């Protein structure tokens, strides 16, 4: 078990500990539960779906990287597939505050990058900030997405974001988590192809500036992130953050990164290179390259 989970795990009910122990035994537990695992945990612990999600929130929050605020937020995105995806907030010392990943963004990006097609609910241990409410409004689940908070009745995103501005106001039909493939040809080595594949998945209906990042760890594991734009622009999640989020949720540290590649168009309206390189260098990675989509 990764050390970050030990305190939260010790506070779980005994029957839930017994069921979770073999799942968490892997140091690189992927911070997600399959639909089958969720069903097993519900039956073993005698909890319904909502109660189980609340019980597991401390494990999600344990994934937080909060060197600046020391305020850990955890979230669990519940996919329409039945799979659950952990998320937690991330802060990057030496970079800028704008590079921060919020817990809800973390869980949602996690689900999206693992191929989830839509979300039924998000469970989070603190009320979503306005930034996250706007981010969630880009999803194909729309304002019907259920939000679950401890000690409160469940509500929909519509309740948390009244008179919402979103993609429909800009006549955007393809939403975040809808299947997309922009068709860029895969070239180069394995890491380069992974970055291009991530760029092909980008949600970028506002700038039409696709981008993807691939990070290679010292053990050969590769994590990718795809660009996810938002109708309100500022809640947009850059591709590097998506990749760093997956890497961290899987129990890796920034020091494990040995190479990074950004895939983007050289003549795009928005360019990720400078911000991507600056953030990676702040985290200690200097082996950074760029491949141009064409």
Curated annotation (Swiss-Prot):
SUPFAM superfamilies: Cytidine deaminase-like. It comes from the Bacteria. Its cofactor is Zn(2+). Residues 48-168, 186-294 form the CMP/dCMP-type deaminase domain. Its EC number is 3.5.4.5. It is an enzyme of class 3 (hydrolase). Zn(2+) binds at residues 102, 129, 132. GO terms for biological process: cytidine deamination. Keywords: Hydrolase, Metal-binding, Zinc. PROSITE patterns: CYT_DCMP_DEAMINASES_1, CYT_DCMP_DEAMINASES_2. Binds 1 zinc ion. GO terms for cellular component: cytosol. The keyword Ribonucleoprotein does not apply. CDD domains: cytidine_deaminase (cd01283). It catalyses: cytidine + H2O + H(+) = uridine + NH4(+); 2'-deoxycytidine + H2O + H(+) = 2'-deoxyuridine + NH4(+). The keyword Membrane does not apply. Homodimer. This enzyme scavenges exogenous and endogenous cytidine and 2'-deoxycytidine for UMP synthesis. PANTHER family: CYTIDINE DEAMINASE. Belongs to the cytidine and deoxycytidylate deaminase family. This is Cytidine deaminase. The gene is cdd.
